[in-house]
Amino acid sequence: MTSPMPPGQTSLLLQMTQRLALSDAHFRRICQLIYQRAGIVLADHKRDMVYNRLVRRLRTLGLDDFGRYLSMLEANQNSAEWQAFINSLTTNLTAFFREAHHFPVLAEHARRRTGEYRVWSAAASTGEEPYSLAITLADTLGMAPGRWKVYASDIDTEVLEKARNGVYRQDELKTLSPQQLQRYFMRGTGPHEGLVRVRQELANCVEFAPVNLLDKQYNVPGPFDAIFCRNVMIYFDKTTQQNILRRFVPLLKPDGLLFAGHSENFSNLVREFSLRGQTVYALSKEKA
């Protein structure tokens, strides 16, 4: 004869086997909260994505109702769960040397500058973009101390931790030349075969920190020669996009460059920036 499960285990089993309900009201509240905290606009067709990502948080916390989860969040505005909430709903699509036409532009710009060349990757995700910037600058300017620096930020603390670790599958580095792979990465052996790690010499030139682009001021060591803010504005509404772009203005050095994603058009949003090349912008008063 099988003995009955304790009540707590029965509840947990039900959570695992039954689909929790996400009401219209709770979905709308989630959309409001992520907009307030991160500026991210969630359309109705993102509902399944929201459900699938947040239901993991509920199960981790032993909750069986979205209303209870939202009440827990709103009861403590300083709760660490807010960061987990943001991390769950941010999208991180990236690759080494994504939108490859930007990197020769960066290299040529760096060659013409004097002093330490400083770049900010404003949506660093898991590190592929800032390390691509670092490789480009190392190939162009060398590795002498004080010659260049990459500052990398993201709102998602989990992806920043992966970026700091600098470990990737080797098949993710197909866009690198064999020389770059050998010069800037160490290959894993034994149980780590198929993985690579960024060499410390390169990693030392990249600094990671959490930054929320919704903040009125950015705690970043500007001004910069170049800012990469690619494929992140698409998640914000027009007013938020305009506010972010205007905050970039004092963070660019004279004749500095702002790089956008392939589907983003910054010159249509604010007068402060004008197109210089394919999704490359400069301050309008400096337009050639």
Kindly label every feature range from the protein language model.
Residues 2-120, 261:
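Conserved AdoMet
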Residues 106, 227, 252:
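Residue-level signal for inorganic ion chemistry
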Residues 116-129, 149-151:
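Conserved class I S-adenosyl-L-methionine
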Residues 126-143:
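Conserved SAM-binding loop of SAM-dependent methyltransferases across substrates and taxa
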Residues 146-228, 232-240, 265-267, 285-287:
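Extended basic-aromatic, gly/pro-enriched interface segments that bind polyanionic ligands
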Residues 242-254:
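A short glycine-rich, Lys/Arg-flanked "PGG" loop and its adjoining helix->strand segment in the class I
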Residues 254-262:
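Conserved beta-strand signature within the Rossmann-like core of class I S-adenosyl-L-methionine
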Residues 263-288:
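Class I S-adenosyl-L-methionine
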